Amino acid sequence: MYLNMTHLRQLESESIHIIREVVSECENPVMLYSIGKDSSVMLHLALKAFYPAKPSFPLMHIDTTWKFREMISFRDQMASEYGFDLLVHINQDGVDQGISPFKHGSALYTDIMKTEGLKQALSKYKFDAAFGGARRDEEKSRAKERIFSFRSANHGWDPKNQRPELWNLYNTRVNPGENIRVFPLSNWTELDVWQYIYLEQIPIVPLYFAKQRPVVKRNGMLILLDDERLKLQPGEQVQMKPVRFRTLGCYPLTGAIESTAATLPEIIQEMLLTRTSERQGRLIDHDQAGSMEKKKQEGYF
């Protein structure tokens, strides 16, 4: 498969510059590792940025306890293989209250297990900068967010109070207690990510590749039967379908797509033809109008 990769090297260079800028300017950075394709690319870029040395910052995963099992095993494998320090934080208060996406709905569940969990971890370890894998092409609130996204002492984001970013100059100054969310992949597209994964042969979670999987159709989405906690509702039936995931999150809130794309070239070809957003499969984005922006103002990724 022939691909003109010149633009990918430009994106790679920009991302590496951003990662190095944070490490040189911030006192205690961390890389948020959500285990998805974007996190895998970001991890790969971090390794390149400081090669042959190991990056000086740890990885951190906010574990909701509802991730796909394959994601958790892949997370542990990558951390061990590359020798990263891996911090795993769970909002134990939410676990003790029995918060789940089935009982409490996606909005409350996301707020407690993801947003509050992230805020707890950032405060606990006193990180002043956190790398994230968000991209501007994913969603409209992310489209207007700066590469260096400044958060208050309460971790909130004010979209009307963002600093200018001129050329490749970034202002990393923060007051005590504040922090920065930094998005090295801001200017990448979904297609760029897949082409770069193909070019660099970056390992990713097998859930991205199509194969026969047990799914149930719920709320117009194909939900993978990942463990025994997913109870069938009246009228639902488990079906074996050739599916894969364009985006990965908590399995009860992430819809698969029917696909036969089982290799990277096939996925890239599928991306060239698609006319829908990858986040159409994320139930949390459908909570209400502007739900992602509201979540980010409250401290979400």
Curated annotation (Swiss-Prot):
Q: Which CDD domains match?
A: Sulfate_adenylyltransferase_2
**Mind telling me which InterPro entries this protein's record contains?**
PAPS_reduct_dom (IPR002500), Rossmann-like_a/b/a_fold (IPR014729), SO4_adenylTrfase_ssu (IPR011784), Sulfate_adenylyltrnsfr_sub2 (IPR050128)
Example GO biological process: hydrogen sulfide biosynthetic process
Single GO molecular function: sulfate adenylyltransferase (ATP) activity
> Might you give the EC number(s) for this enzyme?
2.7.7.4
Q: Which reactions appear under catalytic activity for this entry?
A: sulfate + ATP + H(+) = adenosine 5'-phosphosulfate + diphosphate
Record's keyword annotation contains Glycoprotein: no
Nucleotide-binding among keywords: yes
Instruction: Please give the function described in this protein's UniProt entry.
Output: With CysN forms the ATP sulfurylase (ATPS) that catalyzes the adenylation of sulfate producing adenosine 5'-phosphosulfate (APS) and diphosphate, the first enzymatic step in sulfur assimilation pathway. APS synthesis involves the formation of a high-energy phosphoric-sulfuric acid anhydride bond driven by GTP hydrolysis by CysN coupled to ATP hydrolysis by CysD.
**UniProt cross-references to NCBIfam families, sorted A to Z:** CysD, PRK05253.1, PRK12563.1
Similarity annotation: Belongs to the PAPS reductase family. CysD subfamily.
Q: What is this protein called?
A: Sulfate adenylyltransferase subunit 2
